[in-house]
Amino acid sequence: CAEGGSSIDEWSKESTLFRHAVSEAKFAMENSELIAILWHQGESDGRSKKYKNYYHKLNILVNSFRKELGDLEVPFIVGGLGNYLGKSGFGRSCVEYDLINQELLKYVENNRNCYFVTGEKLYPNPDGIHINAESQRRFGIRYFKAYQTKSSIVEPLDNEANMVKELYEREYTMAEKRYITLEQFTLGKSSMEEVMKFLK
């Protein structure tokens, strides 16, 4: 579940955001396995010394998610904030991003099955706060590596560029091809005949 611009206070266990995330996760768990919780949040807390209470609030949040989802050992992987913050656009006010990152690192060092993924060398969209498409892919690779190795990723991976290239060059699955075909039709960029030809 995503909620842009939310502070950690908006994710308290009584909040709508928390309850919605738990509800969606439980729905998915009806025919899927929960293997990790990924957390990327903090830009809204990267100012006005809010970092001072971040560790405590994150601890309550992690324990609440694990308890509600019935797995006290599920890996919790936190994404660090990018070093492009504090400079432009909507990210300009997030001048304490590095202090949030320090709290995240401290948290994963002190708690079981918690891992950190660096936001270093990721790049924003023109809005100055959200990471661009290629950076999202790099971040995803880092999250996966943290999950796969059960360890924190504190530096960008050496071979990220090649991994991203492989993602772009790989052949689409049939499900992806079907989605693209239907999307093109919906956007008026292909005909019904082309859709029917593909579906045969």
Where are these regions (language model features)?
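Cell-envelope and extracellular/periplasmic
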Residues: C1-K200
